[in-house]
């Protein structure tokens, strides 16, 4: 396979590697090509420095992945905490916790909350993939943490890849001080920091971005993350068709209703045909949960890219028209025109201005939308609801399509009481080191043994699955 190496952030070149090629071997190839000592090279990928003993497969490097290699002398601080503080001291047995790459982070617990503590953002499937990756290429995990809309060449929802770059030099040479734990860490600027490894760059600000995971991408290829779309790890039936599909979209209502992407597409098109999208002053043109739950408008409007190019263009047009109407304007009623106009308040005679080739020149009545006339309007009809295509949801299906109900069942199966205060605590992946969230307790204990955390637990089964 081929990986692309960017050396000192200046230029890139391809390097042929195997899945079992070590990072040190990759350094040796680059060092020979560049005429520099291999021990001065540092390999940066997805927000962390890759250690010499790791292999290409262990690091989740895929065909035509881009890695950054910088020439920088080793420092004493690097020996203990080279990758941003995620690596603890060696255990008595010598086991070392490698800092977790962005390729293994899962933020769905932020959108799909549970009562977890500790490393709640790492799902059980992610922990399994750690051990599976070491067994060979045939065990490569199929679980996808992120989904994006790829505008090209895919033109559809695809698994995504989370990446990070330095906010100063805009190179992907920044190692994170700690990994993101929620979507806000990724989507809100200036929340996360690290250390840029590029020579002469003092940058510490992390900037996250996403790429389509279905095809090789260049440095500049980015895609928008769809944070409501997730793997249907709990096998929740779709609220509309009641089938168990994957992936699914989870609305941000209290019940976290689940809908498959095909039914979400139909829901959007139906509401679009009826012009029943909601115009929100802050969010824009959006839709609530299909069950009509309050306070559930979709905030990330790129989810409507699922409509496809033609319908999405119509969505944008209707959104712009709705904005004009909200401002007190009118739309030209002549077929094929529909220009947005802002006549004076109380002005009955409206002319679709023909300036700049935007208007058609049609003169119409503001009240009845017919050709302009003197006197009373002959007839006025309510446009809304005349041809409404009702999109109804079965109440029983709505009750079964709740992500939170499945979450409660999961919690029952995955919780253990704190050994000191008996408060139930859920383990949602990650290590065996638990901490009671109760302020009066805060006991650190071992999930495996059920006793207070000690050095024996640390050395014996800290990271057992």
UniProtKB/Swiss-Prot annotation:
Any Gene Ontology biological process: regulation of reactive oxygen species metabolic process
Lineage: Eukaryota, Metazoa, Chordata, Craniata, Vertebrata
Chain sites annotated for binding Zn(2+) 5: 418, 421, 436, 441
Activity: how regulated: In the autoinhibited state the side chain of Phe-463 inserts into a hydrophobic groove in RING-0, occluding the ubiquitin acceptor site Cys-431, whereas the REP repressor element binds RING-1 and blocks its E2-binding site. Activation of PRKN requires 2 steps: (1) phosphorylation at Ser-65 by PINK1 and (2) binding to phosphorylated ubiquitin, leading to unlock repression of the catalytic Cys-431 by the RING-0 region via an allosteric mechanism and converting PRKN to its fully-active form.
PTM per Swiss-Prot/TrEMBL: Auto-ubiquitinates in an E2-dependent manner leading to its own degradation. Also polyubiquitinated by RNF41 for proteasomal degradation.
Cross-link (Glycyl lysine isopeptide (Lys-Gly) (interchain with G-Cter in ISG15)): 349, 369
Source organism of the structure: Rattus norvegicus
UniProt-recorded name of the protein: E3 ubiquitin-protein ligase parkin
Enzyme class: transferase
Residues at which Zn(2+) 1 binds: 238, 241, 260, 263
Main localization category: cytoplasm
Domain Ubiquitin-like: 1-76
Residues noted as binding Zn(2+) 2 in the record, renumbered to the chain: 253, 257, 289, 293
Annotated Zn(2+) 4 binding sites: 365, 368, 373, 377
Alphabetically ordered keywords of this record: Autophagy, Cell projection, Cytoplasm, Endoplasmic reticulum, Isopeptide bond, Membrane, Metal-binding, Mitochondrion, Mitochondrion outer membrane, Nucleus, Phosphoprotein, Repeat, Synapse, Transcription, Transcription regulation, Transferase, Ubl conjugation, Ubl conjugation pathway, Zinc, Zinc-finger
Location of the region described as SYT11 binding 1 in the Swiss-Prot/TrEMBL record: 204-238
Positions bound to Zn(2+) 6: 446, 449, 457, 461
One Pfam family cited in the UniProt record for this chain: ubiquitin
Catalytic activity: [E2 ubiquitin-conjugating enzyme]-S-ubiquitinyl-L-cysteine + [acceptor protein]-L-lysine = [E2 ubiquitin-conjugating enzyme]-L-cysteine + [acceptor protein]-N(6)-ubiquitinyl-L-lysine
Polar residues composition bias: residue spans: 80-93
Catalytic machinery residues: 431
Residues that coordinate or bind Zn(2+) 3: 332, 337, 352, 360
Stretches the record annotates as TRIAD supradomain: 234-465
Zinc finger map (RING-type): 141-225, 238-293, 418-449
Pathway assigned to this chain's UniProt record: Protein modification; protein ubiquitination
């Amino acid at each position: 396979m081929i990986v692309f190496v960017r050396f000192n952030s200046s230029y890139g070149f391809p390097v042929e590697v195997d899945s079992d090629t070590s990072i040190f071997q990759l350094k040796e190839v680059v060092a020979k090509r560049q005429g520099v000592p291999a021990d001065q090279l540092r390999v940066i990928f997805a927000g962390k420095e890759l250690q010499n003993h790791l292999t290409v497969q262990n690091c989740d490097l895929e065909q035509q992945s881009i890695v950054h290699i910088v020439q920088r002398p080793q420092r004493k601080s690097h020996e203990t905490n080279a990758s941003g503080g995620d690596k603890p001291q060696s255990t008595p047995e010598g086991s070392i916790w490698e800092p977790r790459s962005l390729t293994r982070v899962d933020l769905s617990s932020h959108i799909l909350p549970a009562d977890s503590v500790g490393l709640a953002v790492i799902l059980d499937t992610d922990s399994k993939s750690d051990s599976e990756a070491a067994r060979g290429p045939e065990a490569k995990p199929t679980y996808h943490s992120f989904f994006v809309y790829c505008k090209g060449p895919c033109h559809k929802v695809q698994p995504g890849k989370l990446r990070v770059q330095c906010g100063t030099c805009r190179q992907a040479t920044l190692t994170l001080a700690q990994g993101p734990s929620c979507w806000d860490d990724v989507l809100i600027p200036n929340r996360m920091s690290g250390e840029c490894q590029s020579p002469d760059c003092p940058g510490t600000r992390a900037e996250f971005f996403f790429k389509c995971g279905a095809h090789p991408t260049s440095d500049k290829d980015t895609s928008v993350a769809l944070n409501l779309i997730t793997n249907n790890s709990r096998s929740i039936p779709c609220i509309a068709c009641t089938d168990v599909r994957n992936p699914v979209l989870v609305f941000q209502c209290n019940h976290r209703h689940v809908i498959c992407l095909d039914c979400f597409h139909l829901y959007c098109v139906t509401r679009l045909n009826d012009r029943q999208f909601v115009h929100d002053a802050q969010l824009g043109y959006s839709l609530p949960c299909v069950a009509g739950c309050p306070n559930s408008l979709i905030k990330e409007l790129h989810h409507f890219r699922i409509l496809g190019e033609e319908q999405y263009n119509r969505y944008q047009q209707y959104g712009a028209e709705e904005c004009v109407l909200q401002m007190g304007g009118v739309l030209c009623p002549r077929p094929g025109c529909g220009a947005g106009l802002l006549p004076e308040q109380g002005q009955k005679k409206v002319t679709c201005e023909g300036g700049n080739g935007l208007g058609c020149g049609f003169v119409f009545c503001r009240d009845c939308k017919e050709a302009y006339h003197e006197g009373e309007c002959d007839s006025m009809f309510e446009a809304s609801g005349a041809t409404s295509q009702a999109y109804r949801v079965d109440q029983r299906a709505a009750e079964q399509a709740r992500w939170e109900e499945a979450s409660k069942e999961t919690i029952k199966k995955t919780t253990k009481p704190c050994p000191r205060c008996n408060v139930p605590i859920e383990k949602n992946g990650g290590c065996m080191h638990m901490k009671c969230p109760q302020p009066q307790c805060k006991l650190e204990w071992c999930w495996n043994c059920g006793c207070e955390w000690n050095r024996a637990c640390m050395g014996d089964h800290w990271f057992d699955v």
